[in-house]
C-alpha cells in the first residue's frame, strides 16, 4: 500500500492561489482533492508530487503545516483601485527570481570584463522636476534622433537605446519558456532590478500593446534613475502616488516632450489623438 502524506488545508489553498488555479479546475485533475482539503483523506507521495508540479510549488512546501511567507524581494509600487495588491502569484515570484539569478550572473561577468558603475544610476531624486529629468533621459538615450513613426518601431528603438547605455532589457508574457504559465498584466506591467553594474528592466508583454510597453520601459528606467528596484503595474497606466506617480510623469514627458505637443493642435476627435499618439509611440490615454 502506498504511503500517505499529511497535508494541511491552508497549504493546499495557498498552492492553488499562487498558481492561479481554482479548486474546481484542480478537482478535474485530482478527484480526491476535496478529501485532502477537509482532512478526510490524504494523498500518496506520488499524488503530492503531481500536485506540486501542477501548482508549480515545491514538494517541501506542501508538507509544511503552514504556507511559507513569500514576500516580494523588491519594492511593490502597484495599486488597484487605489489599494495595494496583497499576495503575489507564483508566476510573478518565479519571474522575478529567474531574472535576479540572471542579473547576478551578468553582474559577475561584466565585472570580469572591467565594467564600472553606470553614471546615470541613482542620479535623480523624486523632488526633481519630471520634465527636467525627461529631457536628460531623451538626451542620454538620443531619442531626439529616433525617426520611428509607429508604436512598434518606437518599442524597438527604445529597447536598443536602453541596451546601448548598459541596461539589460527583458520582455516576456510567460514564465521562462513555459507557454502554459501566462503572466497577467492585471497583476503587474513590469519591474526594475537595480544594480550598479547590471541594471535590469523586465516588461510583461502579455496582451500589452506596444504603446503600453514603451511607457513601461521608460517608467522602469525612471525607477533606476532614482536608484531603486521596483515592481509596477495594477489597474492604471497613469496615476499612482509618490515615486510611482513621479516615474509615470517622467515616462510621459520622455515620450511626449513639450515641443511634440503642438502635433496635437489640430486633433479634434479621439481618432485624431490616437493617430498622432502612435507617431510618438504612446497611447491616446498618455496623450490626453
What are these regions (language model features)?
Residues 1-288:
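Short juxta-domain linker segments that transition from a proline/glycine-rich
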Amino acid at each position: 500500500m502506498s504511503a500517505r502524506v499529511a497535508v494541511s488545508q491552508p497549504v493546499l489553498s495557498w498552492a492553488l492561489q499562487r498558481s492561479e488555479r481554482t479548486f474546481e479546475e484542480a478537482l478535474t485533475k485530482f478527484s480526491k482533492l476535496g478529501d485532502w482539503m477537509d482532512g478526510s483523506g490524504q494523498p500518496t507521495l506520488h499524488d503530492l508530487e503531481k500536485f506540486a508540479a501542477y501548482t508549480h510549488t515545491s514538494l517541501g512546501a506542501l508538507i509544511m503545516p503552514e504556507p511559507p511567507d513569500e514576500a516580494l524581494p523588491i519594492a511593490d509600487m502597484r495599486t488597484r483601485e487605489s489599494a495595494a495588491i496583497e499576495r503575489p502569484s507564483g508566476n510573478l515570484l518565479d519571474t522575478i527570481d529567474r531574472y535576479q539569478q540572471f542579473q547576478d550572473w551578468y553582474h559577475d561577468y561584466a565585472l570580469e570584463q572591467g565594467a564600472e558603475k553606470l553614471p546615470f544610476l541613482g542620479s535623480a531624486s523624486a523632488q526633481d522636476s519630471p520634465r527636467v529629468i525627461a529631457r536628460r533621459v531623451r538626451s542620454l538615450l538620443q531619442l531626439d534622433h529616433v525617426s520611428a513613426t509607429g508604436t512598434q518601431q518606437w518599442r524597438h528603438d527604445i529597447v536598443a537605446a536602453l541596451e546601448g547605455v548598459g541596461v539589460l532589457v527583458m520582455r516576456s508574457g510567460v514564465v521562462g519558456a513555459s507557454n502554459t504559465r501566462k503572466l497577467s498584466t492585471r497583476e503587474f506591467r513590469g519591474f526594475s532590478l537595480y544594480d550598479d553594474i547590471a541594471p535590469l528592466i523586465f516588461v510583461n508583454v502579455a496582451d500589452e500593446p506596444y504603446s503600453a510597453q514603451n511607457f513601461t520601459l521608460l517608467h522602469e528606467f525612471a525607477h533606476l534613475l532614482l536608484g531603486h528596484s521596483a515592481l509596477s503595474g495594477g489597474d492604471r497606466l497613469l496615476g499612482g502616488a509618490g515615486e510611482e506617480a513621479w516615474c509615470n510623469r517622467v515616462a510621459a514627458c520622455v515620450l511626449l516632450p513639450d515641443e511634440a505637443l503642438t502635433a496635437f493642435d489640430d486633433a479634434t476627435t479621439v481618432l485624431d489623438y490616437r493617430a498622432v499618439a502612435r507617431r510618438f509611440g504612446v497611447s491616446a490615454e498618455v496623450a490626453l
